[in-house]
Amino acid sequence: TLDTQSIQDRNIYIVTVPTPVDEDNVPDLSPVRAACKTVGSVLGKGAIVVFESTVYPGVTEDICGPALEEVSGLKCGEDFFLGYSPERINPGDTVHTVDKIIKVVAGQTPEIAQKLADMYGAVITAGTFIAANIKTAEAAKVIENAQRDINIAFVNEVAAIFHKLGISAHDVLEAARTKWNFLGFEPGLVGGHCIGVDPYYLAHRAKEVGHNPEVILAGRRINDSMGTFVADAIADKMEAGGLKGPVLMLGLTFKENVPDLRNTKVIDVVAGLKARGLDVDVHDAMADAAEARTFYDIDLISKIEDGKYACIIGAVPHDDYRTMTAGQIVAMTTPGGLIADIKGMWRKMELPAGYLRWQL
């Protein structure tokens, strides 16, 4: 509903709004503050306000609580209570659905935490976990995504090293994964509104308390640079092969099998290729063409012309692209073209003689 009056005097309010960063990678809490203003205007005594948005430790109690008090005129911890239960969802994942992921909950008091565990437990078949306190639950969520970001940054860095050594990073990782405790992360572009953003929240809070988060920020620098690295590597390969374009980019969304374009790093590859003087067409049947135009000034093509492209780039492993045959891919290229595979989805595919290959 858009009618604030229709949500008056509810027992529990769940706030799950975006938590982006600004152009300087500083946390932008304006959506959270706006939500507090809305909820505060209808908040009644005894209500619980639960936040699910990813934030740094302290936001719920130190920022949201006072914001709710200011608007409602009620006293936090007496008239109303706070809770935190981080959103855990993996877009496009049909196996690890919301109900199958353990739900972390925390409350301002043990009684509030138990009420939230009971509420979420009614729909989460995997069960709930009551965290020690709200700040602990906030911290748990933000390090989940920061850890993943750092692990991907490591394999991205070694992929860059292996590129210079003429070794396939995917072949190296395949061999390394035969050891039981090797972590199976893959190199690639790190975008979206979670993994590429949330580490900045933890880094921001770390700086506020006087700690320099070197590893976290190093991981962000590496991952943010991958678009340019990929673009230059592909452009160099084309130049060495005497190929001048045009280029077809397959996929624009931030990850496979979702339509979400927010913070996609494929756009960095497109920009890098254009900076090298190459014409680039982008195809993504899952993405909304109007959003692509609005967000990135890109006009998605709806139909791929056979025999047009000197280079085909598999950027996002949507099922439609991952299951393409060698014949389908070759049909789109000019003779002797380059097949570039950012995510390794075609690495086992055999191509006709004379075609160039590149993979991250």
What is the role of each PLM region?
Residues T1-L360:
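Structural/interface elements that position substrates and couple domains in central-metabolism enzymes
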